[in-house]
Amino acid sequence: MKDQLEIRKTLVLSTGHVTKRVAEILDEYRSQPEGFDLYWQNIEYGWLFRRTRLDNQDLEYMGRKIPRCLRNCLDLAAANGCDYLIFDCDGPQVDQLPFYNW
C-alpha cells in the first residue's frame, strides 16, 4: 500500500496582530477554557490555533465571544484555506490586519 502524506496548510502571523489584552488572556488560559469552542495551545513564542472544529455556523455563534482582533486573524486563515493559525513573535506582519505595537 502506498503511503499517503497528510499535509495541512498553516497561516503564520505576528503576535502583534492581537491586542496586548488578548495576548494576556491567551497566555493565562494556555489552552481552551471550558465551554469555549476554540482550541489553542501556547507555544514557545506565541500560540497555535486549530480551526478544524469551526464551521460557518460556529463562527457566527462564536463571533460574539471572540475579540475582533482574533476573529479577523481566524477569518484570514479560513479565507486562505488554512487548518491552523500560528501567532509567532517573529511572524510576519500583514497589511490586511491591524497591528498592535505592544
Segments and roles (model prediction):
Residues 52-61:
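Short, basic, glycine/proline-bearing loop/turn elements
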Residues 8, 44-46, 82-84:
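Short, surface-exposed beta-edge/turn micro-motifs
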